[in-house]
A protein has these predicted regions:
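A glycine- and Lys/Arg-enriched "phosphate-lid" helix/loop adjacent to the NTP-binding pocket
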Residues: 121-196
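ATP-dependent small-molecule kinase phosphotransfer cores
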Residues: 51-143
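Walker A (P-loop) phosphate-binding motif
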Residues: 21-47
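Hydrophobic "anchor" residues on beta-strands that sit immediately upstream
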Residues: 28-31, 111, 148
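NTP-dependent small-molecule kinase module
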Residues: 2-19, 47, 163-254
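Hydrophobic residues at beta-strand termini and immediately following loops
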Residues: 60, 151, 210
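Conserved nucleotide-binding/hydrolysis micro-motifs of P-loop NTPases
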Residues: 64-66, 118-119, 153-159, 215-216
């Protein structure tokens, strides 16, 4: 019988056995935060440190699927995305990367660092007026990171860091939903909504909050400490369905 036809119960058992066993396993670590929060800088420093310590590290970035990204880019260029379409396409991009990059790397015991994960979609889409439960369903079966670092900054800090060197684009500034013509003014209004959603998500999903206003070195050393503590956490039972579905669809004989 082909792997894709294996009973879901059997695939769930394989997932539990693979990720719940003894020894070093793959870890998924997400870096989240509003634009200008400093998360990308910290993600790069953290990856360099992990590799120097002997870890095999894979990085995945938001909106980077070779299959879906060109579609999103073309639709953004002509400003033809409704909030619902924006959400659906980014969820499709996310799912493609989970199936082709994230889960294969985790299965092979690598550390996956995600520069933005599903929480970016939740925060931005709800800030655009969509229902949280509706958006969550787009990302099912849900795959939860082992660690989520949320880099908290104020709307003023985010706006200052982003707009000092460039002008936010149409969707980045939220002009599709704010009805504010000035991109800088629109960005400030929109990022307030995004940060408000992030703060709620950080509580609900038990993210680890990092003060993005602190010096870069202080933040980095804090991440090291948290990683040493968090890497010993047991594998989350929540992820069984996501892994089982991937095993069924991929048919890779793992």
């Amino acid at each position: 019988m082909p792997q894709s036809a294996a009973p879901l119960r059997q695939l769930r058992h394989r997932a539990r056995r693979h990720f719940g066993g003894a020894g070093r396993r793959g870890l998924l670590i997400a870096f989240e935060g509003a634009d200008g929060s400093g998360k990308t800088t910290q993600r790069k420093l953290f990856k360099t440190w992990l590799k120097a310590d002997g870890y095999d590290v894979v990085t995945t970035k938001w909106n980077s699927s070779d299959l879906i990204k060109p579609i999103i880019k073309s639709r953004k260029t002509v400003q033809a995305l409704s909030p619902e379409e924006f959400s659906l396409l980014h969820a499709a991009d996310f799912r493609h990367r989970v199936e082709h990059t994230v889960l294969p790397a985790l299965w092979d015991g690598q550390i996956v660092i995600a520069d933005r994960f599903l929480f970016t979609g939740l925060a931005r889409d709800v800030a655009r007026g969509l229902d949280l439960d509706w958006v969550l369903k787009l990302y099912q079966p849900l795959l939860w990171p082992d660690l989520v670092f949320y880099f908290a900054v104020t709307p003023d800090t985010s706006s200052r860091r982003v707009t000092t060197t460039r002008t936010p684009n149409f969707y980045e500034s939220g002009r599709d939903v704010t009805d504010i013509a000035d991109p800088v003014e629109s960005y400030y209004t929109f990022v307030q909504r995004v940060i408000r959603e992030y703060e709620s998500l950080a509580i609900v999903f038990n993210m680890t909050t990092i003060d993005g206003e602190l010096p870069i070195a202080d933040q980095h050393h804090r991440l090291r400490e948290l990683f040493r503590e968090g890497q010993t956490r047991p594998w989350s039972e929540w992820n069984v369905d996501a892994v089982a579905e991937w095993l069924a669809v991929s048919g890779n004989g793992r």
